[in-house]
Amino acid sequence: MVQIDLPAESAVRIRYPTLTKKLRKRSTLVIIVGLLLLCIITSTHISHNFSGSDTPKCRSIYMYPSYARIDGFDSRHTKLAKKYHLYLYREQGKDKEPKHGDEIQLDGIPVLFIPGNAGSFKQARSIAAASANLYFDHKSTIQNSNAKNMDYFTADFNEDFTAFHGQTMLDQAVYLNDAVRYILSMYAQSAAYKESNRPLPKSVILLGHSMGGIVARLMLTLPNHIPESVNTILTLSSPHSTAPVTFDGDILKLYDRVNSYWTSAMNDMGSYFRNNVSVISITGGILDDILPADYTNLQGIVPESNGFTTFTTTIPELWTPIDHLAIVWCDQLRYLLAKYILEIVNDDAGGKTATLDIRMRKGRKFFLSGLERITDADKLIDKNLSAPAVDFSDTESVPENHLLVLNSSESMSTGYAFNISKSVDYSFEMLTSLVQFDIFFCKDIYGKDCINGFSSFSKVPHSTSLQKFPTDSSWGESVSPFRFISLNGSLLQGFQIIVFQGSMKKKEDFVLAKYSDDKSIETASDGLWKLSLFPFRMSLKNKHSFVHGLAFPNLWSSLISFNLKTTFSDEIDSMFRPMMRQYVNNPYETKWHLLAASSSHEINMHNISPFIPLDDTIDKSLNLMFFIPPGEEISLRLSINWKLTLKMLYIRFRLAFASIPISIIALVLCYQFYYYDSPDSKFISFDTGLMNVLNNHSLLIFLFLSVGPIAINHKAILTLLHYLDPISLSKPSSDSHMLNNNYMLGLRETFVWWIGPVFFIISVALLFIILRLINVIEFAVIKISSAITRYTRITFPDPLNDMTHHKLLFNNRQLLGVCFISLGVMVYVPYQFAFILVSLIQMWNCMKLAVFTNRNNAKYSNIHNYNVSFLMLTIFMIPINAPIVVVFLRNFAIRWETAFRSHHNFLAIAPTLLLTLRNSQCNIPIIKNRMNWLIVVSILGYLSFYSFMYGIRNLYWVYHISNILNGVLFFLTIL
């Protein structure tokens, strides 16, 4: 094929692109590779089962639920009373049930559960039942003298699709603010409160699941929010940092508004937010296949003084990943959530919660491993200094850098003492299987002014040959977890001696402790490029220590998973089996791996991720912390796990299967219109255009896809891309250390250069599959049409011979349809619904033209090729518009009679509607001059560029650019 410039005269012969045999072979190879990649990613996503620490281990639950509908919360109190409802959960046999069948008794502290996308109000029952059981049956285990039973209210949103529709999310937030106002007023009428003279509640604890967590944060930004009515928010699998789908512009605008509002409020040191409001985000991690766990990060929105993000694998005595739906009913988690809530309430205060400092300290205790830097401030803070009941003269002194090993009752003396050096280079570490013991940190060597440090110990999984998973020693199991503490020199400043005392009641009990200046963390410089060729190998052995740290500062991408093989001798009579803590410092993700003599462990992390803001000052390392019995030697082999890597690509780049194909279609249309530069030109077919684009420009395309996503990771380029974006919702951070890449694929690591080409090849294969499906349907229609003509002698009139279609812009039937659809969009239905109807019309246009093209190819070839290309673009616009249609139909199904209060812009569908109707008359855009041609090609080029550069995070705007294109094409059909 020879490329030429635009001809000066129409008489110049043009060599149009054709499908040569060589070109077909090349294109077939690309399609086969694309289909193979698609099959590999799909099969790994479906068939690959998680193992080890990623195995789901939630226990089943039971409860005795009942729900009291709050009928008094009607249209007098909220305009949304006919659409939504409010319920009060009551655990049968525990909570006070309504008197006389309808008189609700409130005597506790209010909690409001907010369901997520398509969620049910009944999902509150698991945590509500756990709270009731814990308070009424096990109150002695609650470390809070001001605890009170909880009243769980739950919102019934009729399983609304919150994630798809911004107006729905806004409606829910408005309704819930009205609900909070009504709930607080109910307590003012409560007989129990009147009789006890207790302070009336002035705030409500919010518990949100999935999008319910975003609705909770949105509530505090609205005009109808009651000031200081919310100070505690707990969210489960809620995408705080970025919207999980980008089909609706209202959702993106709400996200931008909410996050900007919260960031500003939290940066104001004197605001109510900064001094009172806490947010804890809990995610299930790798098992969440509904939304990427990366999106739950609060970094940059809420400071660590007010909240944090944690993973269920991090939480002590939970230690299991949880999927998106199970996170509301997982037995271990619901118990910990219920216990946390009961320990942070204060029935004697009007706000009904403890101070922000107490809530955050309790939050770190319950939901972090205790080994994070942020938890250091919570250790050794007991203000009640006292003298321990230990005879210090009878203790055995343990020298510095000496490992204390106790593994039998005969080896225990009265106590063991560690003298503390003034140097901050020393640290103290201790691991034990004992359930109860005393350890005192004293400010003088005589045992006065001491703190009992037992509560500063962290619980870690019990690891012996009998345990296969970390959850084998989680809450509710018969095996108790180990306890571990690590204190650096700065935390020990002010103390002079550590005294340990305990008794071993079991044969397998042990104690390991050491006060030393040994540096137990080694750094491995291996990066992904080296690791892809040569696995990392290392042996760990130290007779004088039991903790070994290994940091990989160059392994930080969440997109790459690893495989760690461990080998050690199982012949040594060890006190415990070696185990490993895998962790990153932000967000707070920890996974525990119990090691076998020869075992393989999958390493997947949520660290630096696409589209998530990055603080370049934080430690990004992948860290491995090994607990090894003294004398044991472990061999390590770390390599890339390609199977798990491919599996995890799908959940992070699902939207790319819409944006990249649209980019390719626009590029092919641009190529087609490049040659269709006059009324006498030939409009080449879609497959011819696509194959020639691949043949002539594949090198340039692959170079752009490989280098582009990585090259833009510079603050100046990101700022430029922001200003080139016509909607510009993702504003560059004012913090010079924050980097937010919302463009292309959001990649940051050069090693993943191949992701762009992979998705491009898959997208090409998808386009050919869809094109062939259209061809098959057309073939069937042609056969049916021929059969009808043969047996009934009914002939279909040739539309190009009917001169009336040249005289009239639209016929009467089309005008009636335009008026009907226009009125419907402006009054009741969203324009997306009209788009689905238009898509069906365009499909019919192509089927009709296939019949006429079969009769007279020369006459109808251009029109048919043009309509098929337009149909391809229309098909990939359907996923962008379908979610809003689903929301609309859901509202219609529940008989919500109020008009759909968004997406009634008739101009958002008019160009596409009018062009489709012109297509049905067998009209094709007429390129009369170079300016017409330049406008069409420029818009198509921009659509292709925008869809790839900005499309994943702004899919809704891709549709609007396409709609503008359709308006231009419609104008060209009437010239």
From Swiss-Prot:
Tell me the membrane topology, using the record's own terms. Answer: Multi-pass membrane protein
Which enzyme class, named as a word? hydrolase
Gene Ontology CC, one term: endoplasmic reticulum membrane
| GO BP term (any one) | protein transport
Q: Which residues are glycosylated?
A: N49, N276, N384, N407, N419, N488, N696, N867
Name used for this protein in its record: GPI inositol-deacylase
Q: Where does the record place it?
A: Endoplasmic reticulum membrane
Superkingdom is: Eukaryota
The reply on keyword Hydrolase is yes
